[in-house]
Design a protein with these regions (language model features):
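Active-site anion-handling motifs in enzyme catalytic cores
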Residues: 1-194
Length: 194
């Protein structure tokens, strides 16, 4: 039978509920090899008695030029501020609205959550990866609280909202220590410039 390998899996946080541990252990043991993108996930797997190693997040496996091949070749007819927000945060919502207003630009939101349709701005639900990248590439400014949103931004003025360790171990896994992470980012910090 074919081998089962999990590449760059994620637990989505830094811990699992005690009641879930036995089931998770049972499910993980179905795999011949497990690799995880966050160091906290490797720790969880190892604590469950399942060997795992940390690997590079898949977003970094392609060069910028490879990602760009996925972007549709069409013109953008308007200027906008783009928001890709994963975690509920009214302060971030208000900031995005005011930021777009201050810049005199339209506000666009990309989301996989249909309930985000009620937030301010034009809502784009679940765009395929090429469209997702097209919106990022054509944005005048990009606001996000997402690791993957940050990773796929290439030389674009952007803000990344700091999230808690529980919400996003990915950010912490990319830096050597939490102290370095804290020095490098603060809430709504400018992280890239053209």
């Amino acid at each position: 039978s074919a081998k089962k390998i999990a590449y760059a899996a994620s637990f989505g946080g830094s811990e699992v509920l005690p009641n879930d541990k036995e089931n998770i252990k049972k499910w993980l043991k179905r795999y011949d090899k497990i690799t995880i993108r966050e160091n906290s996930g490797v720790k969880i797997a190892n604590e469950l008695g399942v060997p795992a190693e940390q690997v590079l997040d898949p977003t970094f496996l392609l060069e910028k030029s490879e990602w760009e091949k996925l972007i549709p070749q069409r013109e953008c007819s308007e200027k906008y501020v783009l928001v890709y927000q994963l975690h509920p945060n009214k302060q971030f919502d208000e900031y995005a609205k005011q930021y777009a207003k201050k810049k005199g630009l339209k506000l666009y939101r990309l989301s996989h959550c249909f309930h985000h349709i009620v937030r301010s701005g034009k809502f784009v639900c679940c765009p395929p990866i090429g469209e997702f990248l097209w919106y990022i590439k054509n944005a005048e400014h990009f606001l996000t609280d997402s690791f993957h949103g940050t990773a796929l931004t290439h030389n674009l003025p952007m803000f990344c909202q700091r999230v808690t360790a529980k919400e996003s171990q990915v950010f912490f896994s990319l830096s050597a220590t939490k102290t370095e992470y804290s020095k490098a980012t603060t809430t709504l910090t400018l992280t890239a410039k053209k």
